Amino acid sequence: MARTASNSTPHQRTRRDHSTETAEDYVEAVADIITERTSCRLVDLAEYFAVSHVTANRIVARLQKEGLLSTEPYQPIELTAKGKRLAVRCRQRHEIVYQFLLSIGIDEQTAAIDAEGIEHHVSPKTLRRFEELVQRNESRDS
């Protein structure tokens, strides 16, 4: 079967979605590492994601081009203002999904693992509903 533009469209979207997930995961990780250790180095990201130094470097370079991270050779990695905003949104979205999973009886370990994947694929509408249900459960439990 010959490849046409319409055949490759789903694959292009999948690659774009994976690229976005990676960006979100990396800015969230940089924020977490900076909070925990006061600075983030390339080796910290490679260790955090269990990837090679080369892979982490390639992703950091891409995120620099996208204006999410800034760094210089042998210097710590920092979040730009744009990167900080994305990290905050990602952390909030992650926490809502995690709390929702806990509220429906999922154990903490499974909820933490599942939230990592779900957070990237939940629509804003669904996320709002998750948040409403979590808040309703919290107010009922108080």
Give residue ranges: language-model regions.
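N-terminal positioning helix adjacent to the helix-turn-helix/winged-helix DNA-binding module
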Residues: T22-D25, R41, K82, R93, ...
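Basic, amphipathic "hinge/linker" alpha-helix immediately C-terminal to the N-terminal HTH DNA-binding motif
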Residues: Q75-H94
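Arg/Lys-rich, alpha-helical DNA-contact motif
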Residues: R91-K125
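Long, low-complexity, charged/polar intrinsically disordered regions in eukaryotic proteins
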Residues: M1-R13
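N-terminal helix-turn-helix DNA-binding core of bacterial DNA-binding proteins
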Residues: P10-V51
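C-terminal regulatory/oligomerization modules of transcriptional regulators
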Residues: M1-T4, I113-S142
